[in-house]
Amino acid sequence: MNISSLIEDGVYPFEKDKVKQNYQKGNFEPIFQTFNVKYDKTLSARTKLILKTWKGKAFYYVNEDILYLLNIDQVEQDFLLKILHSMGIFLQNATSASFFDIYIYDINITEVPYYKSQKLENGTLLDSLTFTLKCYVTPPPEKPEIPW
């Protein structure tokens, strides 16, 4: 599986001004980010069951689930690891959030018909995954100024 299968359709930009205002006020509301990912095949039933258990789980626990529970199907395991890591790195770069402060808030799996040249090929279905991640951003500790 190549990385081109990762399509982030509905990535909504962060309001950086809002994050900055929250820093200044000391008010730390969670930030929600939605990612839409299309998988070029259908996920196995086992993988779908595992994905449904991710609601409310911390990012690092989800990573362990992928590594230990999906070790039978290497293609799906690699695909989900790529998705998870790209989403985590995006949030970390956009908000300076720690991986320990990122949670899977919601996940939806929908089957989408696959159209090729305006024809449906033998009822082929693709899976579309919608992840909503929640993270808390806390300001870095301020260093006291040293008088010289």
Swiss-Prot record:
Q: Give the highest taxon in the source lineage.
A: Eukaryota
Q: Where in the cell is it found?
A: Plastid, Chloroplast
Naming one, the record's GO cellular component terms include: chloroplast
Keyword field: Chloroplast, Plastid
Q: Which family does it belong to?
A: Belongs to the ycf88 family.
Q: What is this protein called?
A: Uncharacterized protein ycf88
Per the UniProt record, the source organism is Trieres chinensis
